[in-house]
Amino acid sequence: MKLWGGRFRKAENQLMEEFNKSFGYDCVLYKKDIEGSVAHVHMQVKCGLLTEEEGKSITEGLKGILEDVENGKLVLDGEYEDIHSFTEINLIQRIGDVGKKLHTARSRNDQVAVDMRLYAKEKANDLVGLISEFKATIKDVADKNPVMMPGYTHLQRAQVVTFKHHLMAYYSMFDRDEKRIKNAIEILDESPLGCGALAGTTHDIDRSITCEQLGFKKVVDNFMDGVSDRDYLLELMSDFSIIMMHLSRLSEELILWSSQEFGFVEIDDLYTTGSSIMPQKKNPDGAELIRGKTGRVYGNLFGLFTVMKGIPLAYNKDMQEDKEGFFDSVHTLEMCIQIMDRMIATLKVNEDKMKQAVKNGFLNATEVADYLVKNNVAFRDAHGIVGSIVIYCEDNKKAIEDLTLEELHKFSDAFKEDIYDFIDYESILNKGIKKNLK
């Protein structure tokens, strides 16, 4: 049974039928489809399209379908065109012809639009919760590890920072991500139910009833936009892509830092794997998979952009292609955030390795220049002097702080005994606004 027909002289081609079906993936919308239908029935009764008795029968039938799906008595499988067909066909089989009245004053166009908004809103709120928990994990691990480490530019050692400050940079990123998703929720929080196929309905319905029951902030302003808008999915998927980019950057650092070449951190065994041939290997597969799956989420976003770019108003079947990519991106992001949260929570920080890397990289060179500036040397001259000192240190395999005052005087008479305290790494982190690094 289909929800359409009558005007066709030929039955649908079997290949076309398979090509047209979406039930294999839009079945995940079953809760939202039933939730939206229950609200629609409530509105139908209020507006005189159904009697109280009819409304009660349909509502109980819908809730029975939901209960049976939840407890496994009714399986989301079969030759249904889509989730809407599944719901309506099973309803009619349960309660008889009165179930055929469910679709009065509704189209699958506004039905799927409300299903997707409800689903997107719920999943977006779930992600806000996951990000909030992840931020708490980041802050906890950062606060417990205020140890010094090299800060990098161009992946070259640059200046001394702290692991805490480095990790809290990601806190700032994910804090912005959380705000972006909350903003997207605010924008999508409009009900399209009642828009019909594209032009509303001749029935004197009240869209505010379903809007309020479904928890939306307001109804959409335009019927045609209401059924053809997928901006909210594009916005959320853009936000997802930015989050994945941030997760990928953090993954890359964990991969580098956990290598023997760095040794700054150790990823817990729970989130690593081994090699089938090399017994010694401990591979950061959790982080690598997050890095790899970032491209997958990007691809889903650009796939939907491409779907939507040439569609005239209003609904077109192309829009069926909005679902798989969105569902996949949501699932991927949920998994990646949770895996990263656990990796960070169980991360072991190697303080000694980080300190050793600081001392081997001339990371106090900028502070040597600052010292000269404080002693009336122009910064550009100071910059050149310190560059020459670094070359001298490299040639003689020394750190700047290990040079004698006599050696330093070869480059400038501005150096005094207090230079050593000034460029001590712990001392550096207590000067000026660098105190904010700790």
From Swiss-Prot:
Pathway: Amino-acid biosynthesis; L-arginine biosynthesis; L-arginine from L-ornithine and carbamoyl phosphate: step 3/3. It is found in: Cytoplasm. It catalyses: 2-(N(omega)-L-arginino)succinate = fumarate + L-arginine. It comes from the Bacteria. One of its GO terms (cellular component) is cytosol. Keywords: Amino-acid biosynthesis, Arginine biosynthesis, Cytoplasm, Lyase. NCBIfam families: argH (TIGR00838). It is an enzyme of class 4 (lyase). This is Argininosuccinate lyase. PROSITE patterns: FUMARATE_LYASES. GO terms for molecular function: argininosuccinate lyase activity. Belongs to the lyase 1 family. Argininosuccinate lyase subfamily. The lineage of its organism: Bacteria, Bacillati, Bacillota, Clostridia, Peptostreptococcales. Its EC number is 4.3.2.1. GO terms for biological process: arginine biosynthetic process via ornithine; L-arginine biosynthetic process. It comes from Clostridioides difficile (strain 630) (Peptoclostridium difficile). Gene3D superfamilies: Fumarase/aspartase (C-terminal domain), Fumarase/aspartase (Central domain), Fumarase/aspartase (N-terminal domain).
